[in-house]
């Protein structure tokens, strides 16, 4: 059977699908990269917020429309199916098979048998199997846990991903060792909340132990940690990230807001002052540390005063990178039942205003790198430039660096930064 896989949504989905591809190949199936060549197309979906759901549904219909032309069987899997299985099955009968959130081996067996698979509640997290690159790139996302126990009032993820389930340090290490042997130069650790890693398995926050283990592996590579929940970003985690040489000093901390009133409504426990103190302490210890965050605007009850507090918070912290999202009213969450909904047009205006403010801040923050030498990872070529990233950018969510010089994908080069705009930098190989 020839199987094509299309991934939507977050990096955790990408990691899942590369593991699934490996399981399918171990079972004797061929992984193809063009749907025209596939007997079966697996579409992995996202259901986090309204925009992601809409994109997933649009892609489902796009693949349904192409079925007759290419003659493949269509399997739709992932978070959207786990959350809306009965509705989807009724509304889109053209889909051949529906699969929710499950273990890769269970998914592979279901695909082979042609049966739907939607667990009542996801209870497993995959054990490492040899994975297959679905894209040529020098980095890999490694999922260290699945599910979440945090209970943010705006978030629907626990309802379809289940409670926290951590992989063992040994299992993750085996996966990373294989990825390094294959030539990966950056290992990006992902989860719904990386700070919670190990609480279920080791009865403690085990991220520092995991980082120390991975840092001890041989080779030249970066370790990047994403999705650090601010309420549980401890001094031990911060110290490990700052002290270990292969861990990049990049802190992805989704604070979500800067108004104490809104933070409380969101179910967050740290106040804005506590957040400022924590983030400032990182910069005091490592001035060039990169701080990235995510913000939700238009949360129920957000007034102009709250929004002004948010802007003041952002200006004071001076985040290097910031993603701003309009609140998505998700059925089944605590926030769904909150009154005082913000007008969508008002929320959109606030998003645009915040992003304009952040563009100025990002531009100013990049000034410190002009004239500096930075390690650069080659990811491709665009015209006369090599394209890639330094340790200061995460893939897909941040800007890129354009460099004049010679190199190939996966090379680490030393470059000097010459100029920048709000998001991207330009330099040359030394």
Swiss-Prot record:
SMART domains: Elp3 (SM00729)
GO-annotated molecular function: 4 iron, 4 sulfur cluster binding; aspartic acid methylthiotransferase activity; metal ion binding; protein methylthiotransferase activity
All residue ranges annotated as the TRAM domain in the record: 367-430
Pfam family, one: Radical_SAM
The protein's required cofactors: [4Fe-4S] cluster
Enzymatic reactions: L-aspartate(89)-[ribosomal protein uS12]-hydrogen + (sulfur carrier)-SH + AH2 + 2 S-adenosyl-L-methionine = 3-methylsulfanyl-L-aspartate(89)-[ribosomal protein uS12]-hydrogen + (sulfur carrier)-H + 5'-deoxyadenosine + L-methionine + A + S-adenosyl-L-homocysteine + 2 H(+)
Residue positions binding [4Fe-4S] cluster 1: 10, 46, 79
Record carries keyword Flavoprotein: no
Keywords: 4Fe-4S, Cytoplasm, Iron, Iron-sulfur, Metal-binding, S-adenosyl-L-methionine, Transferase
Record EC number: 2.8.4.4
Annotated ranges, domain MTTase N-terminal: 1-116
Cellular component, GO annotation: cytosol
Name of the top EC class for this enzyme: transferase
Biological role: Catalyzes the methylthiolation of an aspartic acid residue of ribosomal protein uS12.
Family: Belongs to the methylthiotransferase family. RimO subfamily.
Official protein name in the record: Ribosomal protein uS12 methylthiotransferase RimO
Organism: Thermotoga petrophila (strain ATCC BAA-488 / DSM 13995 / JCM 10881 / RKU-1)
């Amino acid at each position: 059977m020839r199987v094509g896989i299309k991934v939507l949504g977050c990096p955790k989905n990408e990691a899942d699908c590369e593991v699934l591809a490996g399981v399918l190949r171990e079972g004797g199936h061929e992984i193809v990269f063009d749907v025209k060549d596939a007997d079966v197309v697996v579409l992995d979906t996202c259901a986090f917020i309204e925009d992601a759901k809409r994109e997933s549904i649009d892609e489902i219909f796009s693949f349904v429309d192409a079925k007759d032309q290419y003659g493949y069987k269509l399997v739709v899997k992932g978070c959207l199916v786990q959350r809306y299985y009965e509705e989807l099955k009724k509304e889109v009968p053209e889909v051949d098979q529906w699969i929710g959130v499950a273990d890769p081996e269970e998914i592979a067996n279901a695909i082979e048998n042609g049966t739907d698979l939607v667990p009542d509640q996801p209870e497993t997290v995959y054990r490492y199997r040899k994975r297959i690159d679905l894209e040529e790139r020098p980095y890999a996302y490694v999922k260290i846990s699945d599910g979440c126990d945090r209970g943010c009032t705006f978030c629907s993820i626990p309802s379809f991903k289940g409670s926290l389930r951590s992989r063992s340090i040994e299992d993750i290490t085996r996966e990373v060792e294989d990825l390094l042997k294959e030539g990966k130069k950056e290992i990006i650790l992902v989860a719904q909340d990386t700070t919670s890693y190990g609480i279920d398995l080791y009865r403690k926050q085990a991220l520092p132990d995991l980082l120390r283990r991975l840092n001890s592996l041989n080779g030249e590579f970066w370790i990047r940690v994403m999705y650090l929940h601010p309420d549980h970003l401890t001094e031990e985690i911060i110290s490990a990230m700052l002290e270990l040489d292969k861990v990049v000093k990049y802190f992805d901390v989704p604070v979500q807001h800067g108004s104490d009133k809104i933070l409380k409504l969101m179910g967050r426990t740290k106040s804005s002052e506590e957040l400022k103190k924590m983030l400032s302490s990182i910069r005091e210890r490592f001035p060039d540390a990169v701080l990235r965050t995510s913000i939700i605007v238009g949360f129920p009850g957000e007034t102009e005063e709250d929004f002004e507090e948010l802007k003041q918070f952002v200006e004071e912290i001076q985040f290097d990178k910031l993603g701003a999202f309009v609140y998505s009213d998700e059925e089944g969450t605590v926030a769904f039942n909150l009154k005082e909904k913000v007008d969508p047009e008002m929320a959109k205006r606030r998003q645009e205003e915040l992003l304009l403010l952040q563009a100025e801040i990002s531009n100013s923050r990049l000034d410190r790198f002009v004239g500096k030498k930075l390690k650069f990872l080659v990811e491709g070529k665009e015209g006369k430039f090599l394209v890639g990233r330094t340790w200061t950018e995460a893939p897909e969510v941040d800007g890129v660096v354009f460099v004049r010089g010679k190199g190939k994908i996966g090379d680490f080069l030393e470059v000097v930064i010459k100029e920048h705009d709000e998001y991207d930098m330009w330099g040359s190989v030394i």
